[in-house]
Structure formats: C-alpha cells, structure tokens
C-alpha cells in the first residue's frame, strides 16, 4: 500500500514503513497518536495493522452490522477527536434511515442522527490496548478518520465479555475481509 496515494495529505514516501515500525515497537499504543506522528490518516494506520488485527467491511454492510449490534447488550461507544475522547457504556439502539440521516432512537443513553452516507468503511479491530485485548468495530469517513467506534464490553473483572467476543468474531467473518472496502 502506498500511503502517499491513499491519503488526502501528502505523506512521506517512507511513511508506511515508519507506521509499521511504530506499530511493531508499540503494538498496544494509541492509533490516533501514530497517525498524527507520521502525518497520515487514521485509516492508513489501520491498513498497516497485521491481517489478524484488522479487517475491513464495505460501507454497504452498515445496516447489517448495526442491526446485529443492537442485540449485544452493553458495549462502549466512543468518539475520539483531537479535542477529546468521549465514551459511554450503553446498548446500541435501533435506527432508521430518514431525511438523509440514520436516526438512532430507543431506550439507551445513545441517541442522535448520523450522516451515514459519510461512512466510507467499517473496520473490525482486534488488538492489544494497554496490554489487554480490545475488540472494536470502527466506522470511518471518507477523510480516513473515525466517525465513532463501538467496543466489546468488559465485565467487572475488566475481561472482555465472551459472548460479545463470539458475536464480534462471527460478524467480522460474515462481513469483512483484509483489504479494500
């Protein structure tokens, strides 16, 4: 993969090698920090993860993935920007498409309106984060940045919920592959 071609920013010709080295040297670090340090998009960093750590699904799979997530129970919904990281533990409510938005509604702290046509790809990410396994489904926009992320929940002992890990792995197998979305 040539990051200079894939990114909207002009990347260093050696950026891919530098990103891969950073990921190898610090496999459980913050991916947004890797992107910033190497002047590449977040998506480019995801694309440099080993195949066992990231698989990509087409944006056309959004409804299938979202519908499945509504039956997982409590997960962690995260929005990570340069200005902060916002997270809430919640169930994923059902949604409907209307007036150019995917409208989220239901008995959950999570509600709102997504411009889902801006979703360019959906990544299934399974990697260590601060020395613990972390599984997430990440929705990326056309600029290569994360719109939001949905993480498999943890129990009181901070272990991933095994039933959600099984659902994550099954959904990844059914909808994603390593490579272009």
What are these regions (language model features)?
Residues 1-181:
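Eukaryotic intrinsically disordered, low-complexity regulatory linkers and tails enriched in Ser/Thr/Pro
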């Amino acid at each position: 993969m040539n990051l200079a071609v894939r990114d909207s920013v002009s990347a260093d010709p050696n950026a891919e090698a530098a990103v891969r080295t950073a990921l190898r040297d610090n496999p459980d670090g913050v991916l947004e920090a890797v992107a910033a340090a190497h002047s590449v998009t977040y998506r480019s960093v995801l694309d440099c993860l080993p195949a066992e750590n990231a698989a990509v699904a087409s944006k056309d799979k959004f409804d299938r993935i979202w519908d499945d997530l509504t039956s997982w129970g409590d997960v962690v919904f995260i929005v990570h920007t340069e200005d902060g990281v916002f997270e809430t533990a919640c169930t994923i409510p059902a949604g409907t498409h209307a007036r150019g938005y995917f409208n989220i509604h239901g008995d959950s702290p999570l509600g709102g309106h997504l411009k889902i046509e801006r979703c360019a790809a959906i990544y299934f990410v399974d990697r260590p984060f601060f020395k613990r396994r972390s599984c997430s489904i990440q929705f990326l926009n056309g600029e290569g940045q994360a719109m939001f992320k949905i993480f498999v929940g943890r129990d009181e002992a901070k272990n991933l919920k095994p039933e959600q890990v099984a659902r994550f792995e099954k959904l990844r197998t059914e909808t994603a592959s390593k490579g272009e979305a």
